Amino acid sequence: MKTLISNATLVDGTGADRRRADVLLDGPVIAAVVDAGTLSGTLSAAETGADRVIDATGLVLSPGFIDMHAHSDLQLLVNRDHYAKLSQGVTTELLGQDGLSYAPVDDATLAGVREKIAGWNDNPADFDWNWRTVGEYLDRLDRVEESNGEEDGGRIATNAAYLVPQGTVRAMVMGFAEGDPTPGQQQQMQDVIRAAMEEGAVGMSSGLTYTPGMYAQTEELAGLCRTVGELGGFYAPHHRSYGKGALAAYAEMIGLSRDTGCALHLSHATMNFAENKGRAGELLDLIDEALDQGVDITLDTYPYLPGATTLSAILPSWASSGGTEATLARLADPETRARIQEAVEVYGSDGCHGVVAEWGTLEISGVQNPALAGHVGKTVRDIAAETKQEPFDVFAQILTEDRLGTGILQHVGHEENVQAIMKHRTHTGGSDGLLVGAKPHPRAWGTFPRYLGHYSRDLGLLSLEETVHHLSGRPAARLKLHKRGLVREGYAADVVLFDPETIRDEATFENPRQAASGIQYVFVNGTAVIDGGNPTGARAGRALRRHRDGLTREGQQ
């Protein structure tokens, strides 16, 4: 099908000035990008060969947005309309984040990971987990099946690239317990990562405040990064602290990149908690110094103050060693429970970024156990006051009754830090959006319109052209996408049409599942998935694999 988009205000993703243009989509490809009126003013639809003409007067035409930190690994397959992302103009997502996802795995590792990140992605019992390798997972994305295992010929809603998750790899080789790898285990992890990248992963992620990935010392990570770098991939760490010692944690990651030659992409880069208020400039100075020395660094952020994670992440890492059953046993043992309380309330656990838990900042956003549903939307401190218990006792009780599956919002951010970092020359957008839970973080529905509406148009922090570049062309370059991420002839027809005067995020913390305003059309590989502001139900996304030439594109290697 050919679609002519006429009289659009083109913002092409390069950062160049906007211009008026006609753009012709021919199936999955952008066939023509010409001055406005060239196609629409002198030729009829029949003469251009267009099956449809969209008059885009007053609308901006941009590349589809690229979510550099997505947690849609399971939801792309389970809730296939994926309206949360399509409704905000996202056409490509980067999965496998924070060191924990579902490939590569063996049976035991998959069972442990499913339970561990149920608060991120849910854990459906009736779902067919019919892959074990990264290649098989990417094949599954390209061959979507219904829950009964029968193929329906559909596709996923967005395009998706994948990071091999370091914590999952470590669990497969070493289990979920603490400890340093033997030389043989180190080599085995590197071999697993090499295989994953040869099957299409674009890099490696870590979650260094999540077990078991956080048990890795710098030397262990360096070996893994060398393998990733040799294959032209990048390292995307959720590093060891966004609170106490945050700058040292960033410096460790930058040092890894410098020493191993592996490109670095800092996940949800920010400076949180009271001690880091107003300190974003120190982080940016650290990054700029490394960039000037030739270190390859990019980063992503979400444009909100609270973070989102699991309640179990607040535990000290030693308390989570060995997986769910071992953790629950420690919470049930009075002596060990007292040690956990001391770590959380007196010293500040490594899981809580070295900061003493502030119970009034930890808001329950989702639970696995329906009996706990009444806690959603309340902080641990609120629940303690209502039930006349101590906050730590509430914390431990919820973890136990929900088998560590509780999701939370963590209200610890600073607006001045968010604004400073989003203006940096390495910045890209990443929602870090969790799509499950009764009251998930609104960033899952609002990240990209919030950048364009609130921060660009309303506050003027970035020009429209700069903002679109941050959300499309720049992340496409980091991912080494082949002919994708710009509005240019011969590129993939992933495009968005939005009203620059009305685009805004509508999702709030009270009502988080609200579609954005102002996005009129979204095309994924040339197929309209949002049409006139409404979802079409079409799914046209593809798995995007790293190929042997170093570029990332659809299709087998």
Short names for language-model regions:
Residues 195-253:
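Divalent metal-binding pocket/active-site signature
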Residues 333, 420-426, 431-432, 496-542:
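C-terminal cap of metal-dependent C-N hydrolases
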Residues 74-163, 182-199, 222-230:
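Alpha-helical scaffold segments that flank or form the walls of functional sites
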Residues 8, 28, 58, 69, ...:
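Divalent metal-coordination and catalytic microenvironments
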Residues 137-141, 147-173, 179-183, 189-210, ...:
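Active-site neighborhoods of metal-dependent hydrolases
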Residues 1-3, 10-64, 79, 505:
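Histidine-rich, glycine-flanked metal-binding segment
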Residues 11-22, 406-412, 418, 459, ...:
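Acidic, glycine-enriched loop/beta-strand segments at the rims
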